[in-house]
C-alpha cells in the first residue's frame, strides 16, 4: 500500500508531541500533581524556601536593573520621551534622560553615553548605584500607567558600558585653543583633596573648561573614594571606577596617592604657599560614627565598623584596586548588622559573601523609617537576610575573647512622634560577628586643623554656600559627604560639578577676566565628534545628510527655522502650488498606523495621512525661503513645488522659487491622494513621458538643481527615474508615501473618517513600515543609474537606518515620521550616531561589532552566565530543579576559585586607535549594491543551519512551533528541560532565528554536510541545474 503523503510520518509525529493543538475540552489534573508541575517549572524563588543561597566569594552582578541589548532596546522603545521631562528634573546632575534614551532606542549607544557623560562624568557608576526609585524613576510619567516606570538606571548603565567597551578616550573641547594658547588663568594650579566622586566630577569639568594644572591628592593608595572602598563589587565593579578615572586623566588631570589632608602633611596654608589658586575639599567623612558600647572591641573579637569591614571586602574582591591580593574577611556563623541605611545593607549582603551563615539587620525604628532605598532592601531580603526593627543596642556580650551575643531594648514611638527606649523589654540575640553601620563623621582634629581657617557649622562640617559650594575662604570649595548636603553618589557628583563652575569663575576673577552670567560647562567629547559627515550632491554642500522631508515637519518656515537651529542640515518646504491650485485640507487627516499592533504613544512604525499639499500661498513660501537663506547660508533649502501637466505653470512656479533664493527644487510628482484627482502629483508621476516632459520644462526655466520626487505606487520605479534623468533632473527623491487603507472599525467605518458621512479615501502610508519598499526603490535606481543623485525618504528614523540608505546609493536623507514620533532634537542623535558608525569602521579591534552593537556574550537577564556544560559536561536550563543545580555548581566553583587564591591582574586600559582611514559619507554611498542581484546569482550550494546557545535559551519553544507549523519540523523540544535541539533535517530557512525573542540565542552557521532537498516524490526527470 502506498504511503499517505499528506500525513506526518512517525518520526515527525514524535517531534510534534508538544506542538500546540486546538483545545476541544477542559483539562483534568489533580492539585497535588499541579503543585509538582509548578515546582518543576518555577523560575522565581519558592516562597516556601527559607535557606540562604550559598554566596561565598560570589561577587557577580546582582542588580535587578542590569540590561542586555535586547532588554535595553525594549525598555528604551517603551519610554515616552516626554516634553519637559520630570525624570530630568528629578536627576541631581540634570541628565537629559529623554535624549539619551532616544539614542538607545535608535541603537546609538555612543550618542547616549556622550549625553550622559556630558552632565555626569561618573555616568556609569551612577547608572549602577543611583537610587533611581527616589530620583528620576520617581518622576516617570509611566507611573500613571499599568506597565509602570522606565528602568532609567539600567538604560544608563547599558549605554555607558557599551561605550566603555569601545575603548575610546576623552578629548578636550575641540573649540578650545591649544593649551599653550590659552590665557594665563587656565594655567593656574588647582588642588583637590580626595579622589572620590565629588573630586573626580569637579576635576573633569575644570579640565573640560581648559585648565591644565589640576592635581588630586588622595590619602589612600587607591582611588575612587567610597565607590572603591565601600560599595561592593557586586554592585559597582572596580574596573568601572577605574574607567571613569582614566577618562578624567585623558584630559591631563594628575592624581597623587598617599598624600593626606592633615596638619602633619598637607594643609590649606601650605597649599597656598605652593602657589595653588583654588582648592576643592572632597575627602568624604573618613571616620565611623561609633557607639560608646563598642569601645575597646576589635576585629579579632568579631567587631567591625562599616568603615573597617567594607574596605576589607573590597580589597579581597576588587581586581585592580590594590597591587596586592588580600583575602576576604573570614566571617562565620551569625552576623548582626546595625543600621538601616544603604551602607548597612551593603554590609549585610557582603557578609554573606564572606561566609556568614545568617545575617540579621537590626535597626532602631520601623520598616517605614528605613533610610535605605527600596532597591537595596529588596536585594537583602531576596538573599534571606533577616530584619529586626524597633531595637536599640545596649550591650555586647564577649566570652573567651569572642563576641557571642548582643542585648537590645525595644523602642517605641509616642503620640508626639518621639522615640523612647523601653528598658523593660530586653532582647538577647546570639551572634558571632557585629558590624556597626551608624554612619560616618569628620572628627579627626588633625584634619580639621589642616582645613584652618575655614569655618565649620554646628555639625562639625565645613560651612559652604549651597549654591556655589564656596567655603568661608573664597579660594576653597567643598562638596560631597564632607559638606553634609549630598546623601548619594550622584549628589556628590553634582556637588563637584556645581563647584567646578564657581571655581572657574573665582580663578578667572583673580586674573581680571569674567565668565558668562549663565553657567556654560563644556560637553563630553571624543575623537568620534571630529568625524566629518558633510556630503556634496549635485554641486550642493550639505553640512550633514539629514533634512526635513516635504511633509508635516515643514508645515511652516518658522518650523524649518527651529529645525536649522537644532542642527538639521537641509530642509524641503512643504509642497506648494500656484494660487489657482490652492487647497484646503480635511480633518481628521493624520493617524497612527496599525502595523505596530496595540502599541500606543511614540515609536509608531507607520502613519497614514490624507493631507494634501500646503495651504499656504507661493508668496508666503518664496518670501520665507529668502529669509531662511539670509539667516542660514550654510543650510540647504529646497523648494518643493507641484503643478498640473502644464508647461506655463511649471515654468512660472519654478522661476519664482529660484528667484526666492532656494538652493534647489523638488518636483512633487507623487502625492498619492487628492492631488491626483486634480491632475497633479500622482497623475503626473506614474507616466514616464509626462515625467520626462515636466523635467524638460523645468530645466529650461531654471539654472539651479532640481529633483523629481518619485512615487512607489508604480510597477517600475526605475523607468520613472530614468525619464526624470533624461528630462534634465539632477536627481530624484525616492520615495513618497505608499498608497493604503490603514484600517476599519468593527462597524465597518474607516479611520480616518471625515464628516457625518464618515467617508475616507486611500491615504499615504509612511514610517518604518515602508522602509523595505523605499530601500528597494533606492537600490534599484542606484543600480540602474550609477552616480545619479538620490534623496532617500521612507522610514529613516536613526543613524543606523540612514546608513542603510547611504549604503543603498542615496546621498542625503529626508525625515518625517520619526519627527512626528518625537521632535526636532533627534537630529543630535542622528549626527552623533552616524559619526560613531563611521569612526568604528576604522577600529580593527571592533570589526566583530554590528555597528554600535557589541558581539553578544552568553547571558541571562543581561548578565553573563557561566557555561555550565563546560563545568560539568551537562546542559541545564534555568528553572526548577535545574536552576538549583546550576546555583550549586556555580557556588562550588566560586569556593574553588577562592581556594586557588589567584592574584589579581592589574587593570590596563588600551584605547583603540584607528588603523584604517575613517570613511566619509562619499565612501559609503552605494556600498551595499555589490551584494544585490538576481535570484539566479545566489548559491544553492553554500547552505546554513541553525545553532542554538542553550545557556541563553529561555525555553519558550517559539523556534520549535514556527519550525513545525511554518517550516520543516527540524527542531526537537525536550519535554522535561524544554531545551530545543536542531536535527539534521534543518534546511537553514532561518524562521527560528526570526521569531526567537533573545538576540543571538540562535545563529546560522555553515552546513557541514551536503544539502539534499526532500522532494516528497522522486523526480521524474533530472534537474537542469
From Swiss-Prot:
Q: Report the active site residues.
A: 671 (proton acceptor)
- Quick one: which residues bind NADP(+)? 340-343, 364-365, 371, 437-439, 481-487
- Per the entry, what modulates this protein's activity? Inactivated by 5-iodouracil.
Give me the residues that bind [4Fe-4S] cluster 3, please: 953, 956, 959, 963
Q: Which residues bind FAD?
A: 129, 194-198, 218-226, 235, 261, 480-489
Task: Tell where it localizes.
Answer: Cytoplasm
Reading the lineage from the top rank, the first entry is: Eukaryota
Q: Which InterPro entries match?
A: 4Fe4S_Fe-S-bd, 4Fe4S_Fe_S_CS, Aldolase_TIM, Dihydroorotate_DH_cat, DPD_II, FAD/NAD-bd_sf, FAD/NAD-binding_dom, Helical_ferredxn
Q: List GO BP terms, alphabetically.
A: beta-alanine biosynthetic process; CMP catabolic process; dCMP catabolic process; dUMP catabolic process; purine nucleobase catabolic process; pyrimidine nucleobase catabolic process; thymidine catabolic process; thymine catabolic process
Can you tell me which residues bind FMN? 550, 574-575, 709, 767, 793-795, 816-817
Q: What does this protein do?
A: Involved in pyrimidine base degradation. Catalyzes the reduction of uracil and thymine. Also involved the degradation of the chemotherapeutic drug 5-fluorouracil.
Q: Please report which protein family the annotation says this sequence is part of.
A: Belongs to the dihydropyrimidine dehydrogenase family.
Full protein name: Dihydropyrimidine dehydrogenase [NADP(+)]
Q: Which organism is it from?
A: Homo sapiens
Q: Which gene encodes it?
A: DPYD
Amino acid at each position: 500500500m502506498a504511503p499517505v503523503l499528506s500525513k506526518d510520518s512517525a518520526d515527525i509525529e514524535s517531534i510534534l508531541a508538544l506542538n500546540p493543538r486546538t483545545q476541544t475540552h477542559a483539562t483534568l489534573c489533580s492539585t497535588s500533581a499541579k503543585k509538582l508541575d509548578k515546582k518543576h517549572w518555577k523560575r522565581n524563588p519558592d516562597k516556601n524556601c527559607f535557606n540562604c543561597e550559598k554566596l561565598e566569594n560570589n561577587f557577580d552582578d546582582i542588580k535587578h536593573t542590569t540590561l542586555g541589548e535586547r532588554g535595553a532596546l525594549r525598555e528604551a522603545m517603551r519610554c515616552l520621551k516626554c516634553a519637559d521631562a520630570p525624570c530630568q528634573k528629578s536627576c541631581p546632575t540634570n541628565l537629559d534622560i529623554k535624549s539619551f534614551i532616544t539614542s538607545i532606542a535608535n541603537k546609538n549607544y555612543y550618542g547616549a553615553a556622550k549625553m550622559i557623560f556630558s552632565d555626569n562624568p561618573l555616568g556609569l557608576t551612577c547608572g549602577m548605584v543611583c537610587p533611581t526609585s527616589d530620583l528620576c524613576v520617581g518622576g516617570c510619567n509611566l507611573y500613571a500607567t499599568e506597565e509602570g516606570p522606565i528602568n532609567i538606571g539600567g538604560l544608563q548603565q547599558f549605554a555607558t558600558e557599551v561605550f566603555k567597551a569601545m575603548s575610546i578616550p576623552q578629548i578636550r573641547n575641540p573649540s578650545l585653543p591649544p593649551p599653550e594658547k590659552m590665557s594665563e588663568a587656565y594655567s593656574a594650579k588647582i588642588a583637590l583633596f580626595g579622589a572620590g566622586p565629588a573630586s573626580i566630577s569637579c576635576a573633569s569639568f575644570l579640565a573640560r573648561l581648559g585648565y591644565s594644572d589640576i592635581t588630586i591628592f588622595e590619602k589612600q593608595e587607591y582611588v575612587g573614594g567610597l565607590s572603591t572602598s565601600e560599595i561592593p563589587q557586586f554592585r559597582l565593579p572596580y574596573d568601572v571606577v577605574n574607567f571613569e578615572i582614566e577618562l578624567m586623566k585623558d584630559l591631563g588631570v594628575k592624581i597623587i596617592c598617599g598624600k593626606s589632608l592633615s596638619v602633619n602633611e598637607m594643609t590649606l596654608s601650605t597649599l597656598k604657599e605652593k602657589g595653588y589658586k583654588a582648592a576643592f575639599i572632597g575627602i568624604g567623612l573618613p571616620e565611623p560614627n561609633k557607639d560608646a558600647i563598642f569601645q575597646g572591641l576589635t576585629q579579632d573579637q568579631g567587631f567591625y565598623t562599616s568603615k573597617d569591614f567594607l574596605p576589607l571586602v573590597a580589597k579581597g574582591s576588587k581586581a585592580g584596586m590594590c597591587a596586592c591580593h588580600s583575602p576576604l574577611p573570614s566571617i562565620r556563623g551569625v552576623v548582626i548588622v546595625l543600621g538601616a541605611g544603604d551602607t548597612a545593607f551593603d554590609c549585610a549582603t557582603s557578609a554573606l559573601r564572606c561566609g556568614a551563615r545568617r545575617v540579621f539587620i537590626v535597626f532602631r525604628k520601623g520598616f517605614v523609617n528605613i533610610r535605605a532605598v527600596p532597591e537595596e532592601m529588596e536585594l537583602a531580603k531576596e538573599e534571606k537576610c533577616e530584619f529586626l526593627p524597633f531595637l536599640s543596642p545596649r550591650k555586647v556580650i564577649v566570652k573567651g575573647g569572642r563576641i557571642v551575643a548582643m542585648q537590645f531594648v525595644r523602642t517605641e514611638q509616642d503620640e508626639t512622634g518621639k522615640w523612647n527606649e523601653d528598658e523593660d523589654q530586653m532582647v538577647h540575640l546570639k551572634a558571632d560577628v557585629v558590624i556597626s553601620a551608624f554612619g560616618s563623621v569628620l572628627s579627626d582634629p588633625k584634619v580639621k586643623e589642616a582645613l584652618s581657617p575655614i569655618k565649620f557649622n554646628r555639625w562639625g562640617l565645613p560651612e559652604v554656600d549651597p549654591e556655589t559650594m564656596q567655603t568661608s575662604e573664597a579660594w576653597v570649595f567643598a562638596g560631597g559627604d564632607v559638606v553634609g548636603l549630598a546623601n548619594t553618589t550622584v549628589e556628590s557628583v553634582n556637588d563637584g560639578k556645581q563647584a567646578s563652575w564657581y571655581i572657574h569663575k573665582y580663578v578667572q576673577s583673580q586674573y581680571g577676566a569674567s565668565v558668562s552670567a549663565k553657567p556654560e560647562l563644556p560637553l563630553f567629547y571624543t575623537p568620534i565628534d571630529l568625524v566629518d559627515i558633510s556630503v556634496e550632491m549635485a554641486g550642493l554642500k550639505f553640512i550633514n545628510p539629514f533634512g526635513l522631508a516635504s511633509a508635516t515637519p515643514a508645515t511652516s518656515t518658522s518650523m524649518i527655522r527651529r529645525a536649522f537651529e537644532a542642527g538639521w542640515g537641509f530642509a524641503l518646504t512643504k509642497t506648494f502650488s500656484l494660487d489657482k491650485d490652492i487647497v484646503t485640507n480635511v480633518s481628521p487627516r493624520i493617524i497612527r498606523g496599525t502595523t505596530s499592533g496595540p502599541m500606543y504613544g511614540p515609536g509608531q512604525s507607520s502613519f497614514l495621512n490624507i493631507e494634501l499639499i500646503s495651504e499656504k500661498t507661493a508668496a508666503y513660501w518664496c518670501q520665507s525661503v529668502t529669509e531662511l537663506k539670509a539667516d542660514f547660508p550654510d543650510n540647504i533649502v529646497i523648494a518643493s513645488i507641484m503643478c498640473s501637466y502644464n508647461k506655463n505653470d511649471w515654468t512660472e512656479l519654478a522661476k519664482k522659487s529660484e528667484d526666492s533664493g532656494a538652493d534647489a527644487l523638488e518636483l512633487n510628482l507623487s502625492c498619492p491622494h487628492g492631488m491626483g484627482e486634480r491632475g497633479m502629483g500622482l497623475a503626473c508621476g506614474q507616466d514616464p513621458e509626462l515625467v520626462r516632459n515636466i523635467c524638460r520644462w523645468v530645466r529650461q526655466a531654471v539654472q539651479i538643481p532640481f529633483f523629481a520626487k518619485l512615487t512607489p505606487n508604480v510597477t517600475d520605479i526605475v523607468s520613472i527615474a530614468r525619464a526624470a534623468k533624461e528630462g534634465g533632473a539632477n536627481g530624484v527623491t525616492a520615495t513618497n508615501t505608499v498608497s493604503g487603507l490603514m484600517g476599519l472599525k468593527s462597524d465597518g467605518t474607516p479611520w480616518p473618517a471625515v464628516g457625518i458621512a464618515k467617508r475616507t479615501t486611500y491615504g499615504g502610508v509612511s514610517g518604518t513600515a515602508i522602509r523595505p519598499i523605499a530601500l528597494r526603490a533606492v537600490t534599484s535606481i542606484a543600480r540602474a543609474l550609477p552616480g545619479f543623485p538620490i534623496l532617500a525618504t521612507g522610514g529613516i528614523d536613526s543613524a543606523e537606518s540612514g546608513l542603510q540608505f547611504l549604503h543603498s546609493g542615496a546621498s542625503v536623507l529626508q525625515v518625517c515620521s520619526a519627527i512626528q514620533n518625537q521632535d526636532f532634537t533627534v537630529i543630535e542623535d542622528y549626527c552623533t550616531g552616524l559619526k560613531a558608525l563611521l569612526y568604528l569602521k576604522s577600529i580593527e579591534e571592533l570589526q566583530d561589532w554590528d555597528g554600535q552593537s557589541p558581539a553578544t556574550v552568553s547571558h541571562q537577564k543581561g548578565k553573563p552566565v557561566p557555561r555550565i556544560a563546560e563545568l560539568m559536561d551537562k546542559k541545564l536550563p534555568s528553572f526548577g530543579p535545574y536552576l538549583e543545580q546550576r546555583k550549586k555548581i556555580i557556588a562550588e566553583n566560586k569556593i574553588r576559585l577562592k581556594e586557588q587564591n589567584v592574584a589579581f591582574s592589574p587593570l590596563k586600559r588600551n584605547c583603540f586607535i584607528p588603523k584604517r582611514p575613517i570613511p566619509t559619507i562619499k565612501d559609503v554611498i552605494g556600498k551595499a549594491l555589490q551584494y544585490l542581484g538576481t535570484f539566479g546569482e545566489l548559491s544553492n550550494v553554500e547552505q546554513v543551519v541553525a545553532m542554538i546557545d542553550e545557556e541563553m535559551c529561555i525555553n519558550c519553544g517559539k523556534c520549535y512551533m514556527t519550525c513545525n507549523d511554518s517550516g520543516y519540523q527540524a527542531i526537537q523540544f525536550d519535554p522535561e528541560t524544554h531545551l530545543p535541539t536542531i536535527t539534521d533535517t534543518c534546511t537553514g530557512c532561518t524562521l527560528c532565528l526570526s521569531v526567537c525573542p533573545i538576540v543571538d540565542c540562535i545563529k546560522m552557521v555553515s552546513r557541514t554536510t551536503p544539502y539534499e532537498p526532500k522532494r516528497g516524490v522522486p523526480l521524474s526527470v533530472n534537474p537542469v541545474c
